[in-house]
Design a protein with these regions (language model features):
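Lipid deacylating catalytic domains
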Residues: 1-3, 7-125
Length: 125
């Protein structure tokens, strides 16, 4: 499992894409993005420029994107409409949640304490 938040989701996405090219037999069971800016138009444009395709990294077996619609960084909470499935048909699954930690809807610990995120982590462990 790779769990990432905010700018870390862009870094993790890029690393997973590169690893898929260099080590195609490597598999990541679950990629989790929290409060991700991967839906920002400029970010998608840069990914498309570098890779030609805006898609799920080839080595990812499952991708869950958790976002709060009030999170200003997770501008586009529905990544599934932007990222096409990888060659194994794996696509990003969006889950809108309430990140209500102290009224700051982007905090990582607000995402981590959300029941939906905790459940996915618990199932993996």
């Amino acid at each position: 499992m790779i769990l990432s938040h905010s700018m870390g989701t862009i870094i993790a996405y890029d690393v997973l894409r590169i690893l898929g090219e260099e080590y195609p037999r490597l598999l990541v069971d679950h990629f989790i993005t929290l409060g991700s800016p991967l839906g920002l138009p400029h970010v998608k444009y840069k990914i498309a420029q570098e890779n030609r395709l805006v898609r799920t990294p080839s080595i990812v077996k499952r991708w869950s994107n958790f976002a709060d619609k009030r999170d200003p960084v997770a501008f586009d909470v529905h990544l599934s409409g932007d990222y096409t499935p990888n060659s194994d048909g794996v696509k990003v699954m969006d889950d809108l949640i309430a990140n209500d930690w102290g009224g700051i809807h982007h905090k990582s610990y607000g995402y981590l304490r959300a029941p939906e995120v905790s459940r996915v982590i618990r199932e993996f462990i």
